[in-house]
């Protein structure tokens, strides 16, 4: 029972840490103000997570887990959802609340920061990109895209999403970015259709919702 309670407490603290990082970013992370913000002592944070860098790594993993859980629920409800439509839903989810956008921003921030600034190992920073790219790649292969092409297309799609999120953070111009997203996903759909030997779908109007 005590072990279960300890795990629950760790999860509660981790969610609070994620919320704090989502608001304040990864630059100049310090345990003392973070502990104050989440209502625990510095020793309490160290007890559950180890040193600062270990805590940030755990928080980033939690950020990814939250997003994969969202995607997983969509796929359980609709197993036949195409990769392009899954990405459309993901974009809508990102835009649904500032909290969702902040979670996605954390992964991009972690990937972009140098190790000297973040203290994060290179593999952790690379994983912020590689994990999502791999998921997209595997789903494209499942839709019939040849593996080598799926790898390249997944890299392109992940780069597109990263750029769209950065643009959104900087400009807030959702309509323009939605139109750009639809152009990119229409191209992806054409590739999937062509790989299946089907007629390519017509490019949608850029105002598609």
PLM region spans:
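Hydrophobic alpha-helical bundle segments that form small-molecule/ligand-binding pockets
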Residues: 79-80, 116-118, 128-154, 190-201, ...
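Amphipathic C-terminal alpha-helical segment
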Residues: 96, 113-116, 158-176, 188-198
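Hydrophobic alpha-helical connector segments
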Residues: 58, 71-104, 153-157
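Solvent-exposed, amphipathic alpha-helical segments
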Residues: 12, 16-23, 70-74, 106, ...
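Helix-turn-helix
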Residues: 9-12, 16, 20-58
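Hydrophobic alpha-helical segments that form the core
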Residues: 103-111, 134, 147-168, 178-187
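Amphipathic alpha-helical segments used for helix-helix packing
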Residues: 85-86, 98-120, 126
